[in-house]
Regions:
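Substrate-recognition/cap helix-loop segment adjacent to the acidic, metal-dependent catalytic center
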Residues: 1-22
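Short acidic-hydrophobic, aromatic-tinged amphipathic segments that line or gate anion-handling sites
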Residues: 19-23, 67-70, 132-134
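A conserved beta-strand-loop-helix scaffold within acyl/acetyltransferase catalytic domains
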Residues: 131-211
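Acyl-donor binding region in acyl/amide transferases
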Residues: 184, 190-266
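Extended, hydrophobic alpha-helical segments in both membrane/secreted and soluble proteins
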Residues: 1, 31, 47, 54-55, ...
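Terminal substrate-recognition subdomain of acyl/acetyltransferases
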Residues: 37, 59-126, 230-286
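Conserved Lys-Pro-Asp/Glu-containing loop-to-beta segment of HAD-superfamily phosphomonoesterases
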Residues: 31-52, 58
């Protein structure tokens, strides 16, 4: 870290770096460590190195990581990488602006969990606070972004535009939920969304349920479903229906509906929950 500390004129500051790793370990192993701390997919990572041998090691060990073949002249690096459009985004939300800070906070959580005696104690110690509200106009870019980018915790992998999200918000046939989370280390922001579609016979169908991988294993899904069932009871809804559509990347939620008390309707891929029979989950989100 010495160059950052001693050279105040540097454009890149230490605070700009989410996870700082500087050692003599294999770089592929270091990338694995960073990936675990940040809780992102390898296919979202780019590795830049001026040493061809190091680039080859990472390519062979982590084929999902993008490894550009940099030109020999360092003066050409900037234009070369810029032309690859690796960091382009269709839209830019407030959540993107806060990304580095959020990753730094996540690193602190990872450090803490390594010291915890069990998961329950760890989750209690986070002092998590959740908020679930209908979609609002200010959140539309972030909500649309979640539908476009999220692959792992995504029940049906439906991709929606900002116009689609606005339609759902204004529709009498839909209930919409955006879920925010914060804990003692910081604010996760908007990390999950649920869209329910009203169908015949007093039922709602889970059109979309998406959650950021940053909050996996926190119990957010239990918090969300408890709150939604309360609302469905108030409007005299009898059934909540769901569906899991498999993709190459969403195996993480293959058994989610089973865990959430929805029963599979054989031989179809449809699930059903009787609101009357629902038993609220215990969790550590207040």
């Amino acid at each position: 870290k010495e160059p950052f500390i001693k050279h105040s004129e540097m454009v890149l500051k230490l605070d700009d770096i989410s996870v700082f790793v500087a050692n003599w370990n294999n770089k592929a192993d270091n990338i694995r460590y960073i990936q675990e701390v940040l809780n992102i997919g390898f296919d979202s990572m780019v590795f830049l190195d001026d040493n061809p041998a190091e680039r080859d090691i990472v390519r062979k060990n982590l084929p999902e990581v993008t490894v550009p073949e940099l030109p020999e002249d360092p003066a050409l690096y900037l234009s070369y990488v810029s032309n690859l459009n690796l960091f382009e985004t269709a839209n830019y939300s407030k959540n993107d602006k806060d990304r580095t800070l959020q990753y730094q906070q996540e690193a602190k959580r990872k450090k803490m969990i390594s010291k915890a005696t069990n998961m329950d104690d760890y989750l209690k110690s986070l002092k998590m606070v959740g908020q679930i509200t209908p979609f609002n106009k200010e959140e539309t870019p972030r909500i649309a972004q979640l539908t476009q980018r999220s692959n792992q915790f995504n029940l049906r992998t439906k991709r929606y535009t900002e116009e689609d999200i606005t339609h759902f918000s204004n529709s009498n046939k839909h209930l919409t939920y955006s879920i925010k989370l914060k804990d003692k280390y910081g604010d996760y922001g908007l990390i999950s969304l649920i869209i329910l579609e009203k169908i015949a016979n007093g039922s709602y169908f889970i059109d979309s349920w998406i959650m950021s991988c940053r909050v996996l294993n926190r119990g957010v899904e239990y918090f969300a479903l408890n709150e939604i069932i309360k609302e469905l009871k108030k409007i005299n809804i009898d059934l909540l229906l769901g569906e899991y559509i498999e993709t190459p990347k969403n195996n993480l939620v293959a058994d989610l509906l089973d865990k959430l008390q929805l029963k599979k309707e054989a031989p179809y891929n449809q699930y059903k929950l009787s609101i009357e029979d629902y038993k609220p989950f215990n969790h550590y989100v207040s």
